[in-house]
Amino acid sequence: MKQLTETQQLKELIAQYRSEGRTIGFVPTMGFLHEGHLTLVEKASKENDIVVMSIFVNPTQFGPGEDYEAYPRDLKRDARLAEQAGADVLFTPSPSDMYKGEQNVAVQVKRRTDVLCGASRVGHFDGVATVLTKFFNLVKPTRAYFGLKDAQQAAVVDGLIEDFFMDIELVAVDTVREEDGLAKSSRNVYLTEQERKEAPMIYKALQQGAELIRDGERNPETVIKTVTDIIENTSGVIDYAELYAYPELTPLKTLNGKVILACAVQFSKARLIDNIIIDIDEWERS
C-alpha cells in the first residue's frame, strides 16, 4: 500500500492509473477506522482495480461547540487496517494542503440539509460537500463508497454528483452493526458501560417503526411516536426522530415510495445516529 501526504503526489499517481485504464474506487474517511469503513474498502476492492482511501479530519465540517481537536486519531493503526482490508493507496493530507490559505470558492448545499443532522449542524454539509469536491477532483474515482449509517450525507453526495455532472458512481453500503444491532461508529468508544448497554435500543426502536410501516401504517406521526417511546426508556436524549422521502429528504403527510426513518440520540459524551431506509412500494409488491 502506498501512503501519500501531498496532493501533487496523489495527482501524479492518479494520472498514471488513468493512463493505464484502471478503475478507481474511493473511500473517504475521517479515520479512527472501524469495521464499517473496512467493509467499504473490501467492497471497493472487489469492484475496482485500485482502491484509494483518504483519512482527513476535515475542519470545515465541524460546527460551533464541536471539538475538532478532540476527534479521535490513530494513523498508525488506521494504516495497518486499511492495508489489511485491501486499500492500495492511503492519502492523508494536512489541512494546509487541502485548504491553501483563504478559500476562493466553497460549495453551499441548498437542499437535503435542513432536516435530520443538518438542522442542528448549520454549515456542516457545506464543509462535507466542499472537501468531497476537492477529493473527487484529485482522485477522479470511477466509484465512491459511502455507508448508509450517515444516510443524509449519502443523499447530499448523490445531489453533489448529479448537480455537478460528475462521472462518478455513488455506491451506498448498508450499515455495519455490532451483534446487538448497534451501528458501528468511531463515537461508540465514548459510551459509558451503562450507555453501551442501552444504545442498541436505538436500532430496536427503528425496527419497531419499520415493522409498523410493513404492517400498513402510513401516518408518519404514529411511526415516530413508537420510536420515541422506546428510546425514551434509555438515558439518552433524543435530538430528533423523523421520517422523510429518500433521498430527497422532503416531508410526507402519507408514507409512500422510499422513505428514511432516522434518529439521533445524545448520550453523555456521544451523539449516535441511525436509520432504516424502507422501500414501501417494494414491500407492497412482495
Swiss-Prot record:
One of its GO terms (molecular function) is ATP binding. GO terms for cellular component: cytosol. It is found in: Cytoplasm. It comes from the Bacteria. Pfam families: Pantoate_ligase. The active site is at H37. One of its GO terms (biological process) is pantothenate biosynthetic process. Its main location: cytoplasm. (R)-pantoate binds at Q61, Q153. It catalyses: (R)-pantoate + beta-alanine + ATP = (R)-pantothenate + AMP + diphosphate + H(+). ATP binds at residues 30-37, 147-150, 176, 184-187. InterPro entries: Cyt_trans-like (IPR004821), Pantoate_ligase (IPR003721), Pantoate_ligase_C (IPR042176), Rossmann-like_a/b/a_fold (IPR014729). Beta-alanine binds at Q61. Belongs to the pantothenate synthetase family. PANTHER family: CYTIDYLATE KINASE/PANTOATE-BETA-ALANINE LIGASE (PTHR21299), PANTOATE--BETA-ALANINE LIGASE (PTHR21299:SF1). Catalyzes the condensation of pantoate with beta-alanine in an ATP-dependent reaction via a pantoyl-adenylate intermediate. Homodimer. This is Pantothenate synthetase. The gene is panC.
